[in-house]
């Protein structure tokens, strides 16, 4: 007990010294998160051995200390990677590297030098929301390379422009209006500029699977005056689908916004078939279509079938898990999975994106595949792995080694 108390005192004293120093070195911020990790590991060990108090300090629950230790590990990984980038020599304060700021919109990025943007709904000055425009946003692309960009605002929302030309929106004004407005009208005020939306047309219901059609959006430019108001004629903004994507004809700039939050199939086999859909017909020796791959959840029968027939049977069933989220979140998850001795899987991919059928534009968030030997191994994986809240999970079948 005395060893635990002295060890805890030493860790907390080192933390207090770092807080008082108010260092701007990224090495000190990494040290701070490593000390937090050690502190939570000590709490976890104490609680697991029945210790409820260390000195005057109550020992948190096992779940709490475990979650905080994992958070500290994640922050260390991000900061060590950032340290090795060209931006590692910049000033980094405790606030710049705090967990709260890291998760603030745009989530999963480091940010500096924010300014406030106000959105007024229904022409009511008492009905407003505020959002932050960041002068510097540090994010990792799909190749795990850190980039430094700035936030921007246009008639659609607040975004940061990635180096490959994508507008990554972290605030969509139409979504905010659906929460806080009764008429759907909003006005945006930023640095003396103001523009508002005017609903002049309505969108007609579209068939399932048909692409949404969006009208052009003017961008708030530096030439706007303090009293100038720009009207926006729009039809529909996405917000409920898997990917919120708006295409601007005027700027020819691809737009995307990453959704956050875990989503997992709850069906026993994870097939994800909607109610009313029929099981695909299957004749002996038939070749499964792209849609049918993974749709039959049975193990191919053993026997004296030809190699071709067995390969065709196996094409229906190989199990995978597709994880979707920010590239840096997936990188951290992949690191944890490969380092873990408690989780079994066959192989894991690097991060990747879907692309548009007509060009090379990336669509939506990054993805990563985890392949398994059989469905039993996948079920154990889903039971044992605590996935971050910032990723979504989909189950499927995939043929290949």
From Swiss-Prot:
Give start-end positions of Polar residues composition bias. Answer: 218-233, 241-253
SUPFAM superfamilies listed in its UniProt record: E2 regulatory, transactivation domain (SSF51332), Viral DNA-binding domain (SSF54957)
Chain residue numbers at which the record places covalent cross-link Glycyl lysine isopeptide (Lys-Gly) (interchain with G-Cter in SUMO): 324
Where are the residues of the annotated region Transactivation domain?
1-202
* A Pfam family annotated for this UniProt entry: PPV_E2_C
Instruction: List the GO cellular component terms.
Output: host cell nucleus
Function of the molecule: Plays a role in the initiation of viral DNA replication. A dimer of E2 interacts with a dimer of E1 in order to improve specificity of E1 DNA binding activity. Once the complex recognizes and binds DNA at specific sites, the E2 dimer is removed from DNA. E2 also regulates viral transcription through binding to the E2RE response element (5'-ACCNNNNNNGGT-3') present in multiple copies in the regulatory regions of the viral genome. Activates or represses transcription depending on E2RE's position with regards to proximal promoter elements including the TATA-box.
Q: How does it assemble?
A: Binds DNA as homodimer. Interacts with protein E1; this interaction greatly increases E1 DNA-binding activity. Interacts with protein L1; this interaction enhances E2-dependent replication and transcription activation. Interacts with protein L2; this interaction inhibits E2 transcriptional activity but not DNA replication function E2. Interacts with protein E7; this interaction inhibits E7 oncogenic activity. Interacts with host TAF1; this interaction modulates E2-dependent transcriptional regulation. Interacts with host BRD4; this interaction mediates E2 transcriptional activation function.
What is the name attached to this protein's record?
Answer: Regulatory protein E2
Q: Which organism is it from?
A: Human papillomavirus type 1 (Human papillomavirus type 1a)
Q: Which gene encodes it?
A: E2
